[in-house]
Curated annotation (Swiss-Prot):
Keywords: Glycolysis, Isomerase. It comes from the Bacteria. Catalyzes the interconversion of 2-phosphoglycerate and 3-phosphoglycerate. NCBIfam families: apgM, PRK04135.1. It catalyses: (2R)-2-phosphoglycerate = (2R)-3-phosphoglycerate. The lineage of its organism: Bacteria, Thermotogati, Thermotogota, Thermotogae, Thermotogales. The keyword Isomerase applies. This is Probable 2,3-bisphosphoglycerate-independent phosphoglycerate mutase. One of its GO terms (molecular function) is phosphoglycerate mutase activity.
Amino acid sequence: MFDKQEFVSKLVTEEKAKIVLLVMDGLGDIPVNGKTPLQAANTPNLDNLAKESDLGQTIPVLPGITPGSGPGHLSLFGYDPIKYQIGRGILEALGIGVEVGEKDVVARANFATWDGKVVLDRRAGRPATEESAKVVQLLSEKIKKIEDVEITFYPGKEHRFVVKFTGEGLGDKVTDADPQKEGHPMAWAEGLDEPSKKTARIVNELIKKIAEVLKDNSKINFALIRGFSKYPDLPKFPQVYKMKAGAIATYPMYRGLAKLVGMEIIETGQTVADEIKTLKEKWNDYDFFYVHVKKTDSYGEDGKFEEKVKVIEEVDAIIPEIVSLNPDVLVITGDHSTPVPLKAHSWHPVPLLIWSKYTRRGLSQAFNEFECARGTLGTIHASDVMTLALAYAGRLEKFGA
């Protein structure tokens, strides 16, 4: 079978160049009262950049398929998200420094609110990270083993945490123990093969034990567990693209994804301004920078239009600082769309901007979904973004005579 990434890798040259991939998570949207958040936001810097850039839109997986953040990012990094299907658990686990061995299955978990019949809130009101950490500590003290499987809990950000299952004969082909929507009955884990049936049984028993431990907490009284995974084997980004790559991200899952493909994790603060400060400080240390902004996605999922607008404006304000570093290529896009009216990821194409000195500038006047839809790049697969970035950086040889 044709491997596009392997094909591109053979054309990559040793030339030096600086590439920045700025991912605004869940960026794409649909109009509310005639405008998307990108259209409603005051973005003079992004709009000026658009006038000097090639614009287009990406399909992360296939037309009509709604991607998770994992497939969306893998695709942007140049990997086939269908060939490399990775559970979210391993990404979250690696992002917070969890060691994952051969006997381990890891999963991502959310604290939730449950009334005994339906899941009322899949994120338990988004508790503060410190509050969640205390609950994780309580669970660690109360639940250590189920059958012959050791259970280890690790706190994450806000409502998120990681569970590691360690034991013999565990599989990771397990359906999510999560109804995915609020107001729905619980969807319990199911194993799709014999080893995974054991994992599913342990998972469902664990959730019941968690509910028992937390029964007196009106808000944080349940858990949803999903993204079961063992440690996968992927081609490493630095070897494929011949670049030293650094990742600047505040959320564990995205650090985990970057680590999984071989990027170095650069420590940073919690704000967009912190991330750009880190980018400037580490500018001479890497050839490729992946910079991740989470809140565009969070506010899309919460249905908060104005808040999503404000995050876009916050990013717009730091664009001159990135441009002042004079990267050879600046790519601005999202990993998927998260429309405010849907309060969820969607299948809609994702806005894409590529800025370099080699663009066919002059067509576009602003950066938004509709300008991108008519842009010079057209509609492309997200896994082609890295190929384009390398081309705009002068890092690809000619193919053929």
